[in-house]
Protein backbone atom coordinates (compact mmCIF):
# COMPACT_ATOMS: atom_id res chain seq x y z
CA UNK A 1 0.00 0.00 0.00
CA UNK A 2 1.19 3.51 -0.83
CA UNK A 3 2.00 5.68 2.21
CA UNK A 4 3.01 9.14 1.01
CA UNK A 5 4.81 7.69 -2.00
CA UNK A 6 6.43 4.77 -0.15
CA UNK A 7 5.10 1.24 -0.68
CA UNK A 8 4.68 -0.75 2.55
CA UNK A 9 3.35 -4.23 3.33
CA UNK A 10 -0.09 -4.00 4.95
CA UNK A 11 -2.54 -6.75 5.89
CA UNK A 12 -6.26 -5.98 6.22
CA UNK A 13 -9.22 -7.93 7.56
CA UNK A 14 -10.55 -8.30 4.05
CA UNK A 15 -7.56 -10.31 2.82
CA UNK A 16 -7.05 -12.14 6.12
CA UNK A 17 -10.53 -12.65 7.63
CA UNK A 18 -11.22 -13.83 11.16
CA UNK A 19 -12.32 -17.25 9.89
CA UNK A 20 -8.86 -17.81 8.40
CA UNK A 21 -7.23 -16.77 11.66
CA UNK A 22 -9.38 -19.23 13.60
CA UNK A 23 -8.44 -22.05 11.25
CA UNK A 24 -4.72 -21.34 11.59
CA UNK A 25 -4.84 -21.26 15.39
CA UNK A 26 -7.52 -23.89 16.01
CA UNK A 27 -5.10 -26.34 17.68
CA UNK A 28 -3.20 -23.73 19.69
CA UNK A 29 -3.47 -22.86 23.36
CA UNK A 30 -2.78 -19.15 23.68
CA UNK A 31 -1.30 -18.28 27.07
CA UNK A 32 -1.44 -14.56 27.86
CA UNK A 33 1.15 -13.75 30.52
CA UNK A 34 0.40 -10.54 32.38
CA UNK A 35 -2.94 -8.82 32.95
CA UNK A 36 -1.76 -5.24 33.27
CA UNK A 37 -1.76 -2.83 30.32
CA UNK A 38 -2.16 -4.94 27.16
CA UNK A 39 -3.21 -8.24 28.72
CA UNK A 40 -6.89 -7.54 29.43
CA UNK A 41 -7.67 -6.14 25.99
CA UNK A 42 -5.79 -8.72 23.95
CA UNK A 43 -6.94 -11.73 25.97
CA UNK A 44 -10.61 -10.74 26.07
CA UNK A 45 -10.70 -9.88 22.37
CA UNK A 46 -9.14 -13.25 21.53
CA UNK A 47 -11.62 -15.02 23.80
CA UNK A 48 -14.59 -13.17 22.31
CA UNK A 49 -13.31 -14.03 18.82
CA UNK A 50 -13.44 -17.74 19.62
CA UNK A 51 -9.82 -18.64 20.34
CA UNK A 52 -8.57 -20.99 23.07
CA UNK A 53 -7.08 -18.57 25.60
CA UNK A 54 -5.71 -18.89 29.12
CA UNK A 55 -4.18 -16.21 31.35
CA UNK A 56 -1.11 -16.33 33.57
CA UNK A 57 -0.95 -13.81 36.40
CA UNK A 58 0.52 -13.62 39.88
CA UNK A 59 -1.85 -13.17 42.87
CA UNK A 60 -2.87 -9.62 43.73
CA UNK A 61 -5.18 -6.88 42.50
CA UNK A 62 -4.46 -7.66 38.85
CA UNK A 63 -5.31 -11.33 39.42
CA UNK A 64 -8.58 -10.24 41.02
CA UNK A 65 -9.32 -8.06 37.99
CA UNK A 66 -8.82 -11.10 35.75
CA UNK A 67 -11.31 -13.07 37.85
CA UNK A 68 -13.78 -10.18 37.61
CA UNK A 69 -13.35 -10.25 33.82
CA UNK A 70 -14.46 -13.88 33.71
CA UNK A 71 -11.21 -15.84 33.83
CA UNK A 72 -11.70 -18.91 36.02
CA UNK A 73 -8.91 -19.98 38.41
CA UNK A 74 -7.72 -23.48 37.61
CA UNK A 75 -9.55 -23.50 34.26
CA UNK A 76 -8.54 -20.41 32.29
CA UNK A 77 -6.51 -18.52 34.93
CA UNK A 78 -3.23 -19.86 36.26
CA UNK A 79 0.12 -18.87 37.66
CA UNK A 80 2.56 -17.50 35.10
CA UNK A 81 4.56 -20.73 35.22
CA UNK A 82 1.54 -23.00 34.75
CA UNK A 83 0.16 -20.90 31.90
CA UNK A 84 3.56 -20.93 30.18
CA UNK A 85 3.70 -24.70 30.58
CA UNK A 86 0.23 -25.21 29.08
CA UNK A 87 0.51 -22.68 26.27
CA UNK A 88 1.71 -23.46 22.77
CA UNK A 89 1.70 -19.74 21.99
CA UNK A 90 3.07 -17.72 24.89
CA UNK A 91 2.02 -14.08 24.70
CA UNK A 92 4.46 -12.19 26.91
CA UNK A 93 2.51 -9.05 27.81
CA UNK A 94 4.33 -8.27 31.04
CA UNK A 95 6.03 -4.92 31.54
CA UNK A 96 9.60 -4.64 30.27
CA UNK A 97 10.94 -4.83 33.82
CA UNK A 98 8.72 -7.82 34.64
CA UNK A 99 9.85 -9.69 31.50
CA UNK A 100 13.44 -9.40 32.69
CA UNK A 101 12.50 -10.54 36.18
CA UNK A 102 10.56 -13.64 35.09
CA UNK A 103 12.78 -14.60 32.14
CA UNK A 104 14.83 -17.20 34.09
CA UNK A 105 11.55 -18.78 35.23
CA UNK A 106 9.91 -18.52 31.80
CA UNK A 107 12.75 -19.81 29.64
CA UNK A 108 12.45 -23.53 30.60
CA UNK A 109 8.90 -23.49 29.20
CA UNK A 110 10.04 -22.14 25.81
CA UNK A 111 10.37 -25.64 24.42
CA UNK A 112 10.89 -26.62 20.79
CA UNK A 113 7.95 -25.85 18.52
CA UNK A 114 6.36 -23.21 20.73
CA UNK A 115 5.77 -19.58 19.77
CA UNK A 116 6.86 -16.60 21.86
CA UNK A 117 4.83 -13.44 21.21
CA UNK A 118 5.54 -9.87 22.28
CA UNK A 119 3.71 -6.57 21.84
CA UNK A 120 6.88 -4.51 22.21
CA UNK A 121 10.37 -5.02 20.80
CA UNK A 122 12.20 -3.81 23.92
CA UNK A 123 13.25 -7.12 25.50
CA UNK A 124 14.55 -8.63 22.25
CA UNK A 125 16.07 -5.50 20.68
CA UNK A 126 18.21 -4.78 23.73
CA UNK A 127 18.66 -8.38 24.86
CA UNK A 128 22.33 -7.65 25.54
CA UNK A 129 20.97 -5.52 28.39
CA UNK A 130 17.79 -7.43 29.27
CA UNK A 131 19.22 -10.96 29.06
CA UNK A 132 16.15 -12.13 27.12
CA UNK A 133 17.73 -14.39 24.48
CA UNK A 134 15.16 -16.91 23.17
CA UNK A 135 15.99 -20.49 22.13
CA UNK A 136 16.62 -20.89 18.41
CA UNK A 137 14.02 -23.65 17.91
CA UNK A 138 10.93 -21.53 18.63
CA UNK A 139 9.09 -18.86 16.67
CA UNK A 140 9.51 -15.34 18.05
CA UNK A 141 6.94 -12.86 16.77
CA UNK A 142 5.35 -9.53 17.61
CA UNK A 143 2.06 -7.70 17.17
CA UNK A 144 2.20 -4.20 18.64
CA UNK A 145 -1.14 -2.35 18.86
CA UNK A 146 -0.70 1.38 18.32
CA UNK A 147 -2.46 2.34 21.50
CA UNK A 148 -3.31 1.16 24.99
CA UNK A 149 -4.94 -2.13 25.85
CA UNK A 150 -7.96 -0.16 27.04
CA UNK A 151 -8.30 1.49 23.62
CA UNK A 152 -7.89 -1.89 21.91
CA UNK A 153 -10.74 -3.34 23.97
CA UNK A 154 -13.02 -0.30 23.66
CA UNK A 155 -12.63 -0.11 19.89
CA UNK A 156 -13.23 -3.86 19.60
CA UNK A 157 -16.50 -3.55 21.51
CA UNK A 158 -17.48 -0.66 19.24
CA UNK A 159 -16.89 -2.82 16.17
CA UNK A 160 -13.79 -0.88 15.20
CA UNK A 161 -10.10 -1.78 15.29
CA UNK A 162 -6.80 -0.38 16.51
CA UNK A 163 -3.98 -0.51 13.96
CA UNK A 164 -0.97 -2.68 14.83
CA UNK A 165 2.54 -3.29 13.58
CA UNK A 166 3.88 -6.83 13.21
CA UNK A 167 7.32 -8.41 13.03
CA UNK A 168 8.98 -11.81 12.90
CA UNK A 169 12.27 -12.27 14.75
CA UNK A 170 12.60 -16.05 14.37
CA UNK A 171 10.70 -18.43 12.09
CA UNK A 172 11.70 -21.89 13.30
CA UNK A 173 8.45 -23.52 12.16
CA UNK A 174 8.12 -21.91 8.75
CA UNK A 175 4.63 -20.83 9.84
CA UNK A 176 5.48 -17.75 11.89
CA UNK A 177 3.94 -15.29 9.42
CA UNK A 178 0.52 -16.96 9.41
CA UNK A 179 0.50 -17.21 13.20
CA UNK A 180 1.53 -13.57 13.56
CA UNK A 181 -1.19 -12.21 11.31
CA UNK A 182 -3.80 -14.58 12.76
CA UNK A 183 -3.03 -13.30 16.25
CA UNK A 184 -3.09 -9.72 15.01
CA UNK A 185 -6.55 -10.22 13.55
CA UNK A 186 -7.63 -12.15 16.63
CA UNK A 187 -6.78 -9.34 19.06
CA UNK A 188 -8.85 -6.91 16.99
CA UNK A 189 -6.34 -5.05 14.82
CA UNK A 190 -7.88 -2.75 12.21
CA UNK A 191 -4.97 -3.44 9.89
CA UNK A 192 -1.37 -4.57 10.37
CA UNK A 193 1.77 -3.00 8.92
CA UNK A 194 5.19 -4.61 8.74
CA UNK A 195 8.14 -3.60 10.91
CA UNK A 196 11.05 -5.21 12.77
CA UNK A 197 11.60 -5.62 16.50
CA UNK A 198 14.35 -2.99 16.38
CA UNK A 199 12.32 -0.45 14.41
CA UNK A 200 9.27 -0.91 16.61
CA UNK A 201 11.27 -0.49 19.80
CA UNK A 202 13.11 2.63 18.65
CA UNK A 203 10.05 4.32 17.15
CA UNK A 204 7.95 3.46 20.20
CA UNK A 205 10.41 4.85 22.73
CA UNK A 206 10.96 7.92 20.55
CA UNK A 207 7.22 8.54 20.27
CA UNK A 208 6.59 8.15 23.99
CA UNK A 209 9.39 10.55 24.89
CA UNK A 210 8.52 12.78 21.95
CA UNK A 211 5.25 13.94 20.42
CA UNK A 212 2.96 11.41 22.11
CA UNK A 213 3.82 12.17 25.72
CA UNK A 214 7.04 13.92 26.74
CA UNK A 215 7.25 16.63 24.10
CA UNK A 216 3.56 17.44 24.11
CA UNK A 217 3.57 18.02 27.88
CA UNK A 218 6.65 20.20 27.51
CA UNK A 219 5.10 22.20 24.66
CA UNK A 220 1.75 22.68 26.39
CA UNK A 221 3.36 23.69 29.67
CA UNK A 222 5.66 26.20 27.97
CA UNK A 223 2.74 27.98 26.28
CA UNK A 224 0.61 27.86 29.43
CA UNK A 225 3.45 29.38 31.48
CA UNK A 226 4.04 32.20 28.98
CA UNK A 227 0.35 33.10 28.97
CA UNK A 228 0.18 33.06 32.78
CA UNK A 229 3.37 35.13 33.09
CA UNK A 230 1.74 37.75 30.88
CA UNK A 231 -1.42 38.17 32.91
CA UNK A 232 -3.81 35.61 31.43
CA UNK A 233 -6.03 33.72 33.88
CA UNK A 234 -5.64 29.97 34.42
CA UNK A 235 -8.90 29.19 32.62
CA UNK A 236 -8.01 31.33 29.61
CA UNK A 237 -4.47 29.94 29.43
CA UNK A 238 -5.73 26.36 29.66
CA UNK A 239 -8.49 26.83 27.09
CA UNK A 240 -6.12 28.44 24.57
CA UNK A 241 -3.43 25.80 25.19
CA UNK A 242 -5.13 22.46 25.83
CA UNK A 243 -8.91 22.48 25.69
CA UNK A 244 -9.27 23.90 22.20
CA UNK A 245 -6.59 21.50 20.95
CA UNK A 246 -8.13 18.33 22.37
CA UNK A 247 -11.82 19.15 21.98
CA UNK A 248 -11.91 21.09 18.70
CA UNK A 249 -8.78 20.81 16.59
CA UNK A 250 -7.46 17.27 17.10
CA UNK A 251 -10.69 15.65 15.85
CA UNK A 252 -10.37 17.73 12.66
CA UNK A 253 -6.85 16.73 11.69
CA UNK A 254 -7.44 13.17 12.92
CA UNK A 255 -10.31 12.93 10.46
CA UNK A 256 -8.86 14.55 7.33
CA UNK A 257 -5.36 15.87 7.95
CA UNK A 258 -3.60 19.01 9.11
CA UNK A 259 -4.36 20.99 5.94
CA UNK A 260 -8.08 20.35 6.40
CA UNK A 261 -7.90 21.49 10.01
CA UNK A 262 -6.10 24.67 8.92
CA UNK A 263 -8.73 25.22 6.21
CA UNK A 264 -11.48 25.13 8.84
CA UNK A 265 -9.90 27.82 11.03
CA UNK A 266 -9.92 31.59 10.62
CA UNK A 267 -7.63 33.27 8.10
CA UNK A 268 -5.77 34.88 11.00
CA UNK A 269 -5.15 31.45 12.54
CA UNK A 270 -4.12 29.99 9.17
CA UNK A 271 -1.56 32.71 8.47
CA UNK A 272 -0.06 32.51 11.95
CA UNK A 273 0.14 28.72 11.92
CA UNK A 274 1.81 28.59 8.51
CA UNK A 275 4.32 31.27 9.52
CA UNK A 276 5.24 29.77 12.89
CA UNK A 277 5.35 26.04 12.10
CA UNK A 278 8.79 26.54 10.53
CA UNK A 279 10.46 28.13 13.57
CA UNK A 280 8.94 25.47 15.83
CA UNK A 281 10.18 22.70 13.50
CA UNK A 282 13.67 24.18 13.41
CA UNK A 283 13.79 24.50 17.20
CA UNK A 284 12.40 21.05 17.92
CA UNK A 285 14.12 18.85 15.31
CA UNK A 286 17.58 18.96 16.94
CA UNK A 287 16.00 17.82 20.20
CA UNK A 288 14.24 14.99 18.36
CA UNK A 289 17.51 13.96 16.71
CA UNK A 290 19.21 13.90 20.11
CA UNK A 291 16.33 11.85 21.50
CA UNK A 292 16.42 9.32 18.65
CA UNK A 293 20.18 8.86 19.02
CA UNK A 294 19.72 8.26 22.75
CA UNK A 295 17.06 5.64 22.03
CA UNK A 296 18.90 3.86 19.22
CA UNK A 297 22.17 3.44 21.13
CA UNK A 298 20.29 1.81 24.02
CA UNK A 299 20.81 4.64 26.49
CA UNK A 300 17.07 5.19 27.03
CA UNK A 301 16.56 1.45 27.44
CA UNK A 302 19.25 1.35 30.11
CA UNK A 303 17.69 4.29 31.95
CA UNK A 304 14.38 2.42 31.95
CA UNK A 305 15.99 -0.83 33.11
CA UNK A 306 17.91 0.87 35.91
CA UNK A 307 14.96 2.95 37.07
CA UNK A 308 12.30 0.24 36.91
CA UNK A 309 14.52 -2.26 38.73
CA UNK A 310 14.82 -0.14 41.88
CA UNK A 311 12.71 -1.30 44.85
CA UNK A 312 11.29 2.20 45.39
CA UNK A 313 10.49 2.78 41.71
CA UNK A 314 6.73 2.73 42.22
CA UNK A 315 6.85 5.22 45.09
CA UNK A 316 9.05 7.64 43.13
CA UNK A 317 6.82 7.33 40.07
CA UNK A 318 3.70 8.07 42.10
CA UNK A 319 5.39 11.17 43.53
CA UNK A 320 6.32 12.44 40.05
CA UNK A 321 2.78 11.82 38.80
CA UNK A 322 1.36 13.54 41.89
CA UNK A 323 3.39 16.66 41.14
CA UNK A 324 2.12 16.62 37.56
CA UNK A 325 -1.47 16.07 38.67
CA UNK A 326 -1.34 18.84 41.29
CA UNK A 327 0.30 21.43 39.03
CA UNK A 328 -1.78 24.53 38.31
CA UNK A 329 -2.31 23.62 34.66
CA UNK A 330 -3.73 20.18 35.36
CA UNK A 331 -5.72 21.31 38.39
CA UNK A 332 -7.27 23.90 36.09
CA UNK A 333 -8.07 21.02 33.73
CA UNK A 334 -10.18 19.35 36.43
CA UNK A 335 -12.43 22.41 36.67
CA UNK A 336 -12.57 22.90 32.89
CA UNK A 337 -13.66 19.28 32.37
CA UNK A 338 -16.44 19.69 34.94
CA UNK A 339 -17.78 22.63 32.93
CA UNK A 340 -18.12 20.65 29.70
CA UNK A 341 -21.83 20.38 28.84
CA UNK A 342 -21.73 16.59 28.71
CA UNK A 343 -20.51 16.52 32.33
CA UNK A 344 -23.32 18.70 33.69
Short names for language-model regions:
Residues 2-74:
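NAD(P)+-binding Rossmann beta1-loop-alpha1 motif at the extreme N-terminus of oxidoreductases
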Residues 174-229, 235-253:
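Active-site-proximal catalytic alpha-helix in oxidoreductases
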Residues 26-28, 49-52, 85-89, 111-114, ...:
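Short coil/turn connectors at secondary-structure junctions
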Residues 2-3, 8-14, 229-344:
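NAD(P)-dependent Rossmann-like dehydrogenase/reductase catalytic/cofactor-binding core
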Residues 35-40, 59-60, 97, 116, ...:
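Gly/Ser/Thr-rich loops at beta-strand to alpha-helix junctions
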Residues 117-209:
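Rossmann-fold dinucleotide-binding core
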Residues 58, 67-125, 133-148:
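Rossmann-like NAD(P)-binding element
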Residues 63, 83, 99, 234-238:
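Small-residue helix-packing motif on alpha-helices
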Amino acid sequence: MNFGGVIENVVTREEFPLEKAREILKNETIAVLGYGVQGPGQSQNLRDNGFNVIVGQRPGKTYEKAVADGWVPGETLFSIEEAAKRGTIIMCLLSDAAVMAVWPTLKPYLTSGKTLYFSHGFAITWNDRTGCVPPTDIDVIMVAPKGSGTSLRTMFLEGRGLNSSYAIYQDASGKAYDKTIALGIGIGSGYLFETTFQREATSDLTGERGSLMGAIQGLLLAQYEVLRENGHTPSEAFNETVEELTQSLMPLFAAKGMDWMYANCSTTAQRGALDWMGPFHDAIKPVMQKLYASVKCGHEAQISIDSNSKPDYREKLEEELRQLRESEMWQTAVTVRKLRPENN
